């Protein structure tokens, strides 16, 4: 009979899924969840429930459990600790056997780990703070199409951060005028210009027209400056097929870089595009539109460091990473923590920076973090110091808002950057002497002097939301 040895009924998750004696394996995917149980639910039961519902468990005992070796496939909550300074919040550590996940699929990884469990009634709130991805799993992903070193070699740009600018107004320009703005910024000294993430293919500017005029602008600026230039042509569309069509056209135009919104576009589409980009020599710029829907709340959702790790696996050469200064938030230590996760090959566990696990990226190419959002020339010393050479500093309004126009705005940013890099290389302290360095440079650059005057009082200061 089917019922032999099968005891129906509901039993506590913690009897099966809370295993404090478990020794984690090198091949396990490890997760750190911030758990807020409902009143009356013990933390062990809450942690075990998370492990169960994100792996093999369901709410009742089922007889088909007997047809598999549950011990081999179940997630295990192996450690729980209270969050200091928070009432009724715990960090629950969960280990998942590698066999639960399809190779090379961020989509499947997230569907398993965060797909179902966040609506669970026994929890008041749940946040995924960090993941440890084992080398065995990382090796099943291509990762970024090119990575930091290959990008520098392609662009022939070394020893400094790269400069970008988002073309504004983001919506409403015709393709010809849009291309004109691109040309002016690149001609003035920027390395890149960028489609705003909202720009896809709207009635006032269809994608193909924009691609053609931007390519023309780029080649003209290259011919005049002798530098390699790029414009992030935004490829997302209503279907993946249409997105690939746009990427293919970008390659036919011979431009160096395309762009994707990886969260709104989805990980499956993003990984397909990343594979195409590596096969065809295109760089891939990633925007994180929609991230704050997922990562803004301190006690529920998913921290951006997890989304950043996932992007490195799925594939992208640049990703927006907040600014530390400017209008979009990012606490300094926490931001630098996930910036290292994007760029470095080996990152040590460091709870003071929000890094819960040591992560070995086994030589997967790195991703350039992009600092953008409400930044201008006065921020240049801080940005150069905080983000270092391997970054893209992106000034939208901070270029196009220059009183003399786009090209002088670009000149001001380039002069400010070169001055900061030179000062740093001479051993000066950018944090302390930053304003002085910018002032000195503005004496021989009227464009920079005008920019300094316009933005001398602008600040976006609010208390940070993201604390440890």
Swiss-Prot record:
It catalyses: 2 (2R)-3-phosphoglycerate + 2 H(+) = D-ribulose 1,5-bisphosphate + CO2 + H2O; D-ribulose 1,5-bisphosphate + O2 = 2-phosphoglycolate + (2R)-3-phosphoglycerate + 2 H(+). The modification N6,N6,N6-trimethyllysine is found at residue 7. Its cofactor is Mg(2+). Signal peptide: none annotated. One of its GO terms (biological process) is reductive pentose-phosphate cycle. Mg(2+) binds at residues 194, 196-197. InterPro entries: RuBisCO, RuBisCo_large_chain_AS, RuBisCO_lsu_C, RuBisCO_lsu_C_sf, RuBisCO_lsu_fd_N, RuBisCO_lsu_N_sf, RuBisCO_lsuI. The active site is at 168 (proton acceptor), 287 (proton acceptor). Binds 1 Mg(2+) ion per subunit. The basic functional RuBisCO is composed of a large chain homodimer in a 'head-to-tail' conformation. In form I RuBisCO this homodimer is arranged in a barrel-like tetramer with the small subunits forming a tetrameric 'cap' on each end of the 'barrel'. Heterohexadecamer of 8 large chains and 8 small chains. NCBIfam families: PRK04208.1 (NF003252). Belongs to the RuBisCO large chain family. Type I subfamily. This is Ribulose bisphosphate carboxylase large chain. It comes from Couroupita guianensis.
């Amino acid at each position: 009979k089917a019922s032999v040895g099968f005891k129906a009924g509901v039993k506590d998750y913690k009897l099966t899924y809370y295993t404090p004696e478990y020794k984690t394996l090198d091949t396990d995917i490890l997760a750190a969840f911030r758990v807020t149980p409902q009143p009356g639910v013990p933390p062990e039961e809450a942690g075990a429930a998370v492990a169960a519902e994100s792996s093999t468990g369901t709410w009742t005992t089922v007889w088909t459990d007997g047809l598999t070796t549950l011990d081999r496939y179940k997630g295990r909550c192996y450690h729980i600790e209270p969050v200091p300074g928070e009432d009724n919040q715990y960090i629950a550590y969960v280990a998942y056997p590698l066999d639960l996940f399809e190779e090379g699929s961020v989509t499947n990884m997230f569907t398993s780990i965060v797909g179902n469990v966040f609506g669970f009634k026994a929890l008041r709130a749940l946040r995924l703070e960090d993941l440890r991805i084992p080398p065995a799993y990382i090796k099943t992903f291509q990762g970024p199409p090119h990575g930091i070193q290959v990008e520098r070699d392609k662009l022939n740009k070394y020893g400094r951060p790269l400069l970008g600018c988002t073309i504004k107004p983001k919506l409403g320009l015709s393709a010809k005028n849009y291309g004109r703005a691109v040309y002016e910024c690149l001609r003035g000294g920027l390395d890149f210009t960028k489609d705003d993430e909202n720009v896809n293919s709207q009635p006032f500017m269809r994608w193909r027209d924009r691609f053609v005029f931007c390519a023309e602008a780029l080649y003209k600026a290259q011919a005049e400056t002798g530098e390699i230039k790029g414009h992030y042509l935004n490829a997302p569309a209503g279907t993946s097929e249409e997105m690939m069509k746009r990427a293919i056209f970008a390659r036919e135009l011979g431009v160096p870089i395309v762009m994707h919104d990886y969260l709104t576009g989805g990980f499956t589409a993003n990984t397909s595009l990343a594979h195409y980009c590596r096969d065809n020599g295109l760089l891939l710029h990633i925007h994180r539109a929609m991230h704050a829907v997922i990562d803004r709340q301190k006690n529920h959702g998913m921290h951006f460091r997890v989304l950043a790790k996932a992007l490195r696996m799925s594939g992208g050469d640049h990703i927006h990473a907040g600014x530390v200064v400017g209008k979009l938030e990012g606490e300094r230590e926490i931001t630098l923590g996930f910036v290292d996760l994007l760029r470095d090959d080996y990152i040590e566990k460091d709870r003071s920076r929000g890094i819960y696990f040591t992560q070995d990226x086994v030589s997967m190419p790195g991703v350039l973090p992009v600092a953008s959002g409400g930044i201008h020339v006065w921020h240049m010393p801080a940005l150069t110091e905080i983000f270092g050479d391997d970054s893209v500093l992106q000034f939208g309004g901070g270029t196009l808002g220059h009183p003399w126009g786009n090209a002088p705005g670009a000149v001001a940013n380039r002069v400010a950057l070169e001055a900061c890099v030179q000062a740093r290389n001479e051993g000066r302290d950018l944090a302390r002497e930053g304003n002085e360095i910018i002032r000195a440079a503005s004496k021989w650059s009227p464009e920079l002097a005008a920019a300094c005057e316009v933005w001398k009082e602008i600040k976006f200061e609010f208390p940070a939301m993201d604390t440890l």
